[in-house]
Amino acid sequence: MSSDTMFINSARLLPTENRKVKQLQRPDRKKHTRGSYAAQKQQLPNGEQPNFGHGQKQSRKRGSGRQKGRDGAAGDSANVGLTEDLKQLLSIPSGSAGSESAQKETSAGQPATGAVADRKRSVPAGGPAGKSSSEPASASSAVDGMPGLGFQSAHVPFSSPVVNHPMLAEPAATGPVLSVPFPGHVAGYMPCVNNTRVQYPLQTRNNVPMSQPMSQPMSQPMSQPMSQPMSQPISPYLPQGFQMHPQSFVGLPVAPMYPQYMSAQYQSPKQQSACQMPLRAQPPLIPSITRNALPCVSSANSTAKASVRSKGSPGSEGGSRRSQNWKSSQNVGYAGATFATDQPALSSLPKPSFV
């Protein structure tokens, strides 16, 4: 800023009687003090003061609208309605204590009369109402065997896209090898890795000893429809990563198209619970082929690269010609600029001793 511009600005701002031409200074410097001045209070466009969580007492004194709605009669009624809704949502109907005790008794192996009576009242017609709690339920009521969903399904109809899936109600049986038991995977069963493919008859599944008492109501409904191999239609849905044999629909024995450890993962829940420690899986065949084939390819590539390098070695004439042509073509694009590589006397200097 030049001196004349500063004079014009100061003359326009200063009053005429207090004008000092020799000692020009800005008028705002007089008003400033060396101490810190109080900042102006912020105000929102709607007229309220901003509340960042530190001014609760001040906002109560002013009586802002936000605190009125929170502590007033309207806020109390809204809170009462919310608590009533939560009570209705979380309330357990009458007889739930009996159903919980009945679930504990059935897990211990004792018959329960209160749970049977409650289920007879709550289950609609056509369902397994006449069966006792010790008898296995059908595949449609397989949710009752899940841990944590048994006493709720006795009073509230439980509907879920996972449970009502067609694959859960009608499992597919393909020849001597069974497909995946989906309710077992929904309940949290993990497949046990085994290196032998299971091709036993279907009736021998019931003789496998059980190690977990809670998985019995889940696996019993699945054993009934699977006892007849081709009685139910095969569902078109297949689990992810499951490969179907082309001739398994006819029932012919076919060699496995994938490594054996893949087929052993899809077993019944009883067989999975019976094996305590996962056995060592057989390594797949495809990586072994690639291990044998990769060194040959790499050796061929290395020999080819060596031959190319031998052709273009700097000692031969062809290699020197190519390098000279490449240098000349690279140096053409620069307008008269010289580099150290253009002068061999500078580029081939002896290296210092400390390097």
Swiss-Prot record:
The keyword DNA-binding does not apply. One of its GO terms (biological process) is nuclear-transcribed mRNA catabolic process, nonsense-mediated decay. The gene is EDC1. It comes from Eremothecium gossypii (strain ATCC 10895 / CBS 109.51 / FGSC 9923 / NRRL Y-1056) (Yeast). Belongs to the EDC family. Residues 1-146, 210-230, 301-330 are annotated as: Disordered. This is Enhancer of mRNA-decapping protein 1. It is found in: Cytoplasm. Residues 57-67 have a biased composition (Basic residues). Residues 123-142 have a biased composition (Low complexity). The keyword Repeat does not apply. Residues 39-49, 91-110 have a biased composition (Polar residues).
